[in-house]
Amino acid sequence: RVEDNSSLFGIRGTEDLGGGLKAFFQLESGFRLDSNNSSFATRNSGIGLQGGWGSVLMGRWDMPYKVAGYPADPYVLLTLAGYWSSVQDSGNFGRRPQNVVQYWTPNIGGFTARVAVTANEGKTATVDPKDFSAMIGWARGPIVVNVAYEKHEDQVGSTATAGAEEEGLMGVVSFKFGGTKISGIVERIEKTGRANRENFYVSLVQSIGKHDIIGTAGQTKGGQANGAAGSEPKADAVSIGYRYNFTKRTQMNVLYAKIKNNATSAQNFPLLPVPGVGNGSDPEGVSFGIVHVF
């Protein structure tokens, strides 16, 4: 099976309003060349104001929790092997909700933070679904450290459910020395009616001139329904990739990725699932792509 799931097109712009204030906008869409059935502004799209006090954004945008993991992910959603597309519970904690309001602080001594809340548009007499997400980060030279928290109220995944809660806590570290970058993510997810889920992910990028050799390994375990029979679900994910940087704006990527499930786990590639994957299955895939930024 051949799929095109990571082609993107976007535009952005700013206007100087004077007095240190700027307006900014972005419209970004994912599109599929193989099926031509894409919608408009499905990715980070919004409008906001920016000043010395920080930025305020309204629209559809990645939550701070999701953004916190970017420094450790050498693929950042573009392939089968990224954190959010291999071991993470992306159906719940890789969100890009619509009608979100976010505040981003300015950089203060290397520290930055983001906070986001969503509109509770699905509110009824019995449920009031809404999200809260926040991250704080510190970067100095080759070191990046991020911590993030997110909570979903009255929700199980994208389904409104009275009394249900989902919470996630994530820690991210990335360190670069010379042409080598080593990164890691540790995450714990708690959900009503389920055992805690723990995720681990490490990545290594070795740059030699225009060539990047990339390796990743991750594990997810737990998350089963309370009282479920059998052993604890566990899945291991690995990948090996190569990137050639033609210029600063154009690169080529190729990689191989595989997920190995134990007898009670059915982890799949969340962004591009392989059909028919059940407990104990081991999905795998090859990805090839070209990125050009203009």
Where are these regions (language model features)?
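Extracellular/periplasm-exposed beta-strand and loop segments of Gram-negative cell-envelope proteins
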Residues: 1, 76-90, 166, 186-191, ...
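Outer membrane beta-barrel
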Residues: 1-120, 128-130, 137-144
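Transmembrane beta-barrel domains of outer membrane proteins
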Residues: 10-14, 48-50, 102-105, 116, ...
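Outer-membrane beta-barrel and related beta-rich outer-membrane complex signature
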Residues: 37, 68-76, 127, 159, ...
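Extracellular loop and loop/strand-boundary signature of outer-membrane beta-barrel proteins
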Residues: 88, 120-121, 157-159, 190, ...
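Detector for outer-membrane/organellar transmembrane beta-barrel domains
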Residues: 127, 131-245, 256-258
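Outer-membrane beta-barrel "beta-signal"
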Residues: 240, 246, 278-294
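C-terminal beta-signal and adjacent terminal beta-strands/loops
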Residues: 246-252, 256-268
